[in-house]
A protein has these predicted regions:
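Membrane-embedded alpha-helical bundles of polytopic integral membrane proteins
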Residues: 1-157
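Juxtamembrane interface at the ends
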Residues: 105, 166-175
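Re-entrant/interfacial helical elements at transmembrane boundaries that shape
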Residues: 109-110, 170-173, 196, 201
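Hydrophobic transmembrane alpha-helices of multi-pass small-molecule transporters
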Residues: 136-137, 194, 198, 207
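Interfacial loop-to-transmembrane junctions
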Residues: 172-195
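Juxtamembrane boundary at the C-terminal end of a transmembrane helix
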Residues: 203-211
Length: 211
């Protein structure tokens, strides 16, 4: 490993630790800090999108992108409005999404042979996707109970769909990352793209099936 690669790995790891600590801390602290967290994420996401290069004529106009993250972030704020405040459902959601990302990488890196959507995200494979879904299901089982195993699988699949949507948007604009706010990780939407479809569906399913 070269010195540059080592430094990049250390930077990525430190950024990841700080990122996870801040997000989990804000969610766990109170309903107000949870709402503030997602409001800040929304503002940063909008800033990244509006600073991005213009896409082809068939791309979505930038003003329309203003609405894109609203359902996901509003769902996480709404879930924090329970009285008394209970951060566990939101934390469980975060762990499922992160487990999906980790499982997809751990399985896809050595075993990924069949590409999921090479034109949009060449690094993603069917094997990695299944590994991510399995990891998310395992976290749902551990955090919420065996009866929620299916929910983890659904969140894993929807997280991947959000990731692919963001990748397609970046590719049409010839962008590698959505920004550079998080050293070693890219922009804010590179970390939260998995929430786009998963968070609203999670909130709806939780409302229907949670005791």
């Amino acid at each position: 490993m070269t010195a540059a690669h080592r430094n990049e790995t250390v930077t990525r790891a430190l950024t990841g630790v700080v990122f996870v600590a801040v997000v989990m801390g804000a969610v766990a602290w109170s309903a107000w800090s949870n709402a503030l967290l997602w409001a800040v994420v929304a503002v940063l996401a909008w800033a990244e999108w509006f600073k991005a290069p213009e896409g082809p004529p068939t791309s979505w106009p930038k003003p329309l992108l203003f609405l894109f993250p609203v359902p996901a972030l509003a769902a996480l704020v709404w879930m924090g409005e329970a009285d008394p405040y209970d951060p566990w459902p939101i934390l469980s959601f975060l762990w499922m999404i992160w487990a999906n990302d980790t499982g997809a990488y751990v399985v896809g890196k050595p075993f990924g042979k069949r590409k999921l959507w090479p034109a949009v995200s060449p690094g993603k494979s069917w094997e990695g996707t299944l590994g991510g879904v399995a990891a998310a299901a395992g976290v749902a089982w551990a955090a919420l109970g065996s009866e929620w195993l299916w929910l983890g699988g659904v969140m894993g699949a929807l997280s991947t769909a959000g990731d692919l949507t963001q990748s397609a948007w970046k590719r049409r604009r010839h962008m590698k990352d959505s920004g550079n706010l998080l050293p070693g990780h890219g922009g804010i939407m590179d970390r939260f793209d998995g929430f786009l479809f998963a968070a609203p569906v999670y909130a709806i399913l939780w409302c229907i099936f949670a005791p």
